[in-house]
Amino acid sequence: MAVQQNKSTRSKRGMRRSHNALPITQISVDKVSKEIHRRHYITMNGFYRGVKMIEK
């Protein structure tokens, strides 16, 4: 089993964990349907960048 030699400080622990944060999801509004959606994703109505991609 691995056992640490010395106690890690709160500062070093925080620096190590600084890359663990989840990125904030980017949100956009479609030009045509005015629907809120994630960036680079199709809307629930089937629009992507103002063009109807999927017929429901």
Curated annotation (Swiss-Prot):
GO terms for biological process: translation. InterPro entries: Ribosomal_bL32, Ribosomal_bL32_bact, Ribosomal_zn-bd. It comes from the Bacteria. Keywords: Ribonucleoprotein, Ribosomal protein. Residues 9-19 have a biased composition (Basic residues). Residues 1-23 are annotated as: Disordered. SUPFAM superfamilies: Zn-binding ribosomal proteins. The keyword Zinc does not apply. GO terms for molecular function: structural constituent of ribosome. The keyword Ribonucleoprotein applies. One of its GO terms (cellular component) is large ribosomal subunit. Belongs to the bacterial ribosomal protein bL32 family. HAMAP family: Ribosomal_bL32 (MF_00340). This is Large ribosomal subunit protein bL32. The gene is rpmF.
